[in-house]
Each structure stands twice: as structure tokens, then as C-alpha cells.
């Protein structure tokens, strides 16, 4: 699970982990954002992956056999138009698409299918029932590479922070104005509810820059003054490649 990955990195059991953070169709992967909040881990890179979903079953099965479809929640949402053609199918959430493929392979039940990629088809010797069941063909997911070491290279170009403001009129607006004042391009802003504090939120922000830049240093100083909490998650390079 994502939690196990993050906890493994934080404890030093693994050097790096890759977490999905946002999909181009259905938006943010909320549990990933919540998991990296207030943890001793850092974002050290970002990569983009083109998503191709396929309906897979066990060898010898046909679409007419299917009664249940297993996959990750995001994959089920990204294939909702195809799945909507089969309202009688039970849609069952799994921790990830690879686990769903392994599960149906282990059960050997022709009534079970999964949504996963072609690699899992080969890995678990599954039948391709329907290729490319995505709602949209141009379907991409951004992934963060995380580590318990704050690794920053000279050409790091993006910064991610989590912050929280006082619950008073204009507090968030004043904080966001800092980005404009220093000419920093904010490329992402998300609000997430605070644990055990109803109707209170923290904010996840991505912006372009390098921590060595003077304007970035000054902007973060002002943001810290205007917030009640600020965590710099990382300053990293974006790898515009498909993995």
C-alpha cells in the first residue's frame, strides 16, 4: 500500500518510493498528499507515466463470463465509461492494479476480471478481454519519487510545500499574494482537511523555483511569517519522460 511505502522510506528500510500524486483525468490522489504531510520524507523527483488500462481475465475467460471487476479506485474511475456499459458487474476496489491482477490469477475464477496494464497480463498469464478501456486515450499520472534524504540537484526547478493559515478572513489570500509579489509561478494548489479538526484545512502548493534563488528564500520567509505551519516537501527536477 501507499502507507507501507511511505513508512518504509521514513524508517530507512528502502531508499526510494514512487507515489502517484495526480491523474490528468480524475485529479489528485488524495491519500498520497495526506501521507507525506508531517513526515520525515522528501520529494526528490517527479516523473510522468502514460496510463493504459485493459480488461483482463483468467486464461480461457470471455467478457460474457464476468461478474466482478477488481482494480484500484483511480483505475475504476478512469474507466467509468466502459464499466458503465456493464452495470451488472460488481466493481471491487483493491490497493493497486497489480494486486488486482495477481488476485484474479490466484482465484482462477472465470467470473473475475481486473483492470490493469499489459505487464501484469504477462506476469500473471492473464487473458486480454478488452484493450484500452480508458475514458480518454491521453491519460497521464504524475508520480513523486520520495526519499528520507533531502536530495537537491543544482537544476532543481520545482518546489512543493504544505502550509496552514489562521482561520481568519483574508489569511489565505495574503499568503498566496506572496507568490505574485516575488514573481513565482504557482502551478498547483490543493486544500486538504486537517485530521480531527473539522472544517480546518491545510494547503498543498507546487511552484516553480530553486531554493538557492534569493527571491525564493525571501518568499518562503514571508510565507512562514503569514502561516502557522510550513513544511518544505522538496525541491526537485521534473523528468518529462514516459516510464
Language-model segments: what does each one mean?
Residues 1-243:
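Domain-level signature for soluble enzymes in the chorismate/prephenate branch of the shikimate pathway
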Amino acid at each position: 500500500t501507499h502507507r507501507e511505502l511511505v513508512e518504509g522510506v521514513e524508517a530507512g528500510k528502502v531508499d526510494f518510493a514512487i507515489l502517484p500524486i495526480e491523474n490528468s483525468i480524475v485529479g489528485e490522489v488524495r491519500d498520497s498528499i495526506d501521507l507525506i504531510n508531517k513526515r520525515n520524507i522528501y520529494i526528490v523527483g517527479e516523473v510522468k507515466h502514460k496510463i493504459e488500462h485493459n480488461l483482463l481475465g483468467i486464461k480461457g475467460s470471455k467478457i460474457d463470463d464476468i461478474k466482478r471487476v477488481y482494480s484500484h479506485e483511480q483505475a475504476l474511475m478512469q474507466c467509468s465509461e466502459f464499466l458503465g456499459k456493464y452495470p451488472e458487474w460488481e466493481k471491487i476496489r483493491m490497493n493497486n492494479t497489480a494486486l488486482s491482477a495477481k488476485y484474479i490469477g490466484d482465484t482462477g475464477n472465470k467470473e473475475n476480471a481486473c483492470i490493469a496494464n499489459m505487464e501484469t497480463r504477462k506476469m500473471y498469464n492473464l487473458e486480454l478481454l478488452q484493450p484500452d478501456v480508458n475514458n480518454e486515450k491521453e491519460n497521464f499520472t504524475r508520480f513523486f519519487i520520495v526519499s528520507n534524504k533531502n536530495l537537491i540537484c543544482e537544476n532543481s526547478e520545482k518546489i512543493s510545500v504544505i502550509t496552514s493559515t489562521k482561520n481568519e478572513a483574508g489569511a489565505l489570500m495574503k499568503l498566496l499574494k506572496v507568490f505574485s509579489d516575488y514573481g513565482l509561478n504557482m502551478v498547483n494548489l490543493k486544500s486538504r482537511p486537517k485530521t480531527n479538526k473539522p472544517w480546518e484545512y491545510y494547503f498543498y502548493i507546487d511552484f516553480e523555483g530553486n531554493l538557492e534563488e534569493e527571491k525564493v528564500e525571501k518568499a518562503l520567509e514571508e510565507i512562514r511569517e503569514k502561516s502557522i505551519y510550513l513544511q518544505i516537501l522538496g525541491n526537485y527536477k521534473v523528468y518529462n519522460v514516459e516510464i
